[in-house]
């Protein structure tokens, strides 16, 4: 349904399809990985599961910059975020767990919170109600990273551990960002309908 809202404009449709694909890719890789038992196939899926996080990070910002920004502010951030994603996936493939324990986590956070500048621009152009799902979705992802990094808390031993809480945080963050994107999937929001916005242009 998200992609369908972009019909009639090929640029919007492609950018929305990128986000939809990255979301489905992450959820699919994670599901298959957790269903497999120990072995080579599970090891391969673990690599794909972690690579999918980079793809989702870049895929999430793609429609926001493709639809809401123009010129330099559209293409440069997209080029940067996809370059970081490609770098992260490549390093993950080469160095495996030796890299991802700390450096990879840092890359995830940099990719996510690197979009804070864009969030502020959109906040000023429209208002807080427009960007709140983007902002709190980022908070949810960050909380998940902190939980999995600290390996704490364990709510119910063997049932609800930091790993399960990480997955909950990802679902919450993804849902918020999906709903945020749905706001403008059909085109640019009407600035005039948001009288408290300062109407700062990002062009």
Which stretches of residues belong to each language-model region?
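Multi-pass alpha-helical transmembrane bundles in non-GPCR membrane proteins
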Residues: 1-203
